[in-house]
Amino acid sequence: MTSATSPIILKWDPKSLEIRTLTVERLLEPLVTQVTTLVNTSNKGPSGKKKGRSKKAHVLAASVEQATQNFLEKGEQIAKESQDLKEELVAAVEDVRKQGETMRIASSEFADDPCSSVKRGTMVRAARALLSAVTRLLILADMADVMRLLSHLKIVEEALEAVKNATNEQDLANRFKEFGKEMVKLNYVAARRQQELKDPHCRDEMAAARGALKKNATMLYTASQAFLRHPDVAATRANRDYVFKQVQEAIAGISNAAQATSPTDEAKGHTGIGELAAALNEFDNKIILDPMTFSEARFRPSLEERLESIISGAALMADSSCTRDDRRERIVAECNAVRQALQDLLSEYMNNTGRKEKGDPLNIAIDKMTKKTRDLRRQLRKAVMDHISDSFLETNVPLLVLIEAAKSGNEKEVKEYAQVFREHANKLVEVANLACSISNNEEGVKLVRMAATQIDSLCPQVINAALTLAARPQSKVAQDNMDVFKDQWEKQVRVLTEAVDDITSVDDFLSVSENHILEDVNKCVIALQEGDVDTLDRTAGAIRGRAARVIHIINAEMENYEAGVYTEKVLEATKLLSETVMPRFAEQVEVAIEALSANVPQPFEENEFIDASRLVYDGVRDIRKAVLMIRTPEELEDDSDFEQEDYDVRSRTSVQTEDDQLIAGQSARAIMAQLPQEEKAKIAEQVEIFHQEKSKLDAEVAKWDDSGNDIIVLAKQMCMIMMEMTDFTRGKGPLKNTSDVINAAKKIAEAGSRMDKLARAVADQCPDSACKQDLLAYLQRIALYCHQLNICSKVKAEVQNLGGELIVSGLDSATSLIQAAKNLMNAVVLTVKASYVASTKYQKVYGTAAVNSPVVSWKMKAPEKKPLVKREKPEEFQTRVRRGSQKKHISPVQALSEFKAMDSF
């Protein structure tokens, strides 16, 4: 980097012909094309055709001569205007003129005799010399542009030095104003240079340096002002010196990028994918061997050594403080499984040694090996996501606590909170590096490491700003300085958070967030029952933070997709969580804390709090289900612990899972599938009876167009949910656990309540007392059977340990659920029929004109479209004569009773 007093030094060899900008490349390309075309004329050697002048060659020679003349004119103009490199530019122009003349003569002679290899060789040498001369001229012109940029940089450096040497605040304001003007000019010139740079790395470096200059310039004034106002506070000098150093490094970065001499990412340690990811990738590649050349002595030690290195890295992650115990156990189990898979694979290679083709057992062993490494990767990703979910939660709290302590002027307290803040910053950096270690996203890893480096260097300066404020709590300048560093810290944390999110999977994030929210919900319930207000408040805050992060990340993720049914479903789930579920949860937390904090503990509805907490978990789970809707089977396989992982971490005190008795992490649905065959047969009989009742409902609702008829819509919804519940009793369907079945029962109850409201409105308008009483009676049945279904929804398989053998049984609870669903289905069928009859009675007595706003619209469903002309089968081409059918008059009531749709919904 140049100092304010040193001359401008160009880190660029003028003799080098390396093209560094797109402009030089664009200007040179036409001449290269013309010369190449000319050189390649008659490149096939002597021919039997009559010798003579080549019209094409003469035309090309003339175009080369004209292009050379254009370069000469532009070069002379640049040499006149240039303050730097004037002599070099003039010499380059003369060289182009000389080589151009040589090329003109050589090309003319070649055009006259294009079959002469001697003349062709002379022209080729002249062409090379001309291209070199023109390239050198363009590169020198490019250097002149860089020199102008470096001149701007020197002016900015001098202005920066002036700001640093300001003696009072008025002097600082004046000098900073001049610095700002020069900054604007420099930014404009640097932006132009950035667009011209050919090397993407240099463009990135230029952009980063410009960003750093702009970012630190905002802190330069307040840090300098704080130093001038409070020179006796050591922290102010540290702040000022830090900002000056950052600005100087940014200026040096612009200089290096402009000259394409930036330090490489390798030198900065920012390059490459994660170390653990790279090791796993390499291991996966190394296990594919040729049995013909396999040697145990050669390959076994190498593969085992590579695997142990990977396992060492995995062990470090497993032993980290934020890694959950269950996750640690899974990582250890996967490491052991990978070890065993490698030994099995090596054994198969030994069995196949010398064979040309791999046998099936060997291919199976290779597939098993890759599957085990994939499983290990997944557990490592989830472990990292555990860290991210915990560390990147409420990232501003340590900073706000530090600032509040500083405002109070308590320096001792500030130093204590500064240590907490430093540990928080170190944790962010550590977790960010962990995320990098298992990521294959090279560009993303680079951004995360750069952002983490910025966090690491900024942390001490935030503490210095807090120490300044603590020493001078009444000083507005100290407060402004603190605000600037606070804003900068928050921006940098956001940058780091977004960078980390970019290199991690949204599926992993949702899976882990769901588990963590479940843990926190259970902690909240325990704290509530124990009257622990602090734990309740803190854990509820964590739940709100986790939910807010889920909403933010998923909304951002959906911006990557085109709007459609998928995004609508996902955004609908996030909207429900943010606008309905979380406000209710916050309200219940406030009520609980107020009740527990009162001098005399006040009674409150504990179940309301539990329900509100459960809805948060359900909301996040629904978002995850919606996001996974478009995943391929392979992607879902990679998230194969979707079913197991979400439940086996729950405690025995969990309100969510007190009815979910699990066997080795299996879901309740999976356990239902393990019922004895006798019980399965009896359940199948009950399901068959249920299906008969369902077919009646299908036939009834299929008659009607459901647009404008919410009774039909609700009947369909209830039928669909009841089908899922009966499928659960057979170990099938989308419902996995008792909690899912309970949720389904709640949805049916909600639908039943809405149907009750609509049907009662129909009954109120019905003048026929008999029809009205029938309809109300059926509605009472719906309410009764909904309640029964809610009770029976706590269906679970009972697991007994008899003589060391696990015995699974669940016939009674399953048949009760199916019977309740069948009864409810029958009540819904009768309600639909009675609602229609009640509606027709009203219209029959009063006429349709009297109905201003009917409750629901009863319109027959249009039949399926059929071709107007029936296509004959090939074998039925003969003309047929049939007797015309006799027309019959059919009453509307008879038509309605006979109408039956072919397809159930």
Curated annotation (Swiss-Prot):
Start-end of Basic residues biased regions: 880-890
Record region (Disordered): 869-891
Membrane topology value: Peripheral membrane protein
GO biological process: axonogenesis; brain morphogenesis; cell-cell adhesion; dendrite morphogenesis; negative regulation of Arp2/3 complex-mediated actin nucleation; prepulse inhibition; radial glia guided migration of Purkinje cell; regulation of neuron migration
PANTHER family recorded: ALPHA CATENIN, CATENIN ALPHA-2
Subunit structure: Interacts with CDH1 and CDH2. Interacts with ZNF639; recruits CTNNA2 to the nucleus. Interacts with F-actin.
GO cellular component terms listed in the entry, alphabetical order: actin cytoskeleton; adherens junction; axon; catenin complex; cytoplasm; nucleus
Name assigned to this protein: Catenin alpha-2
Modification type Phosphoserine: residues: 640, 651, 853, 891
Record function comment: May function as a linker between cadherin adhesion receptors and the cytoskeleton to regulate cell-cell adhesion and differentiation in the nervous system. Required for proper regulation of cortical neuronal migration and neurite growth. It acts as a negative regulator of Arp2/3 complex activity and Arp2/3-mediated actin polymerization. It thereby suppresses excessive actin branching which would impair neurite growth and stability. Regulates morphological plasticity of synapses and cerebellar and hippocampal lamination during development. Functions in the control of startle modulation.
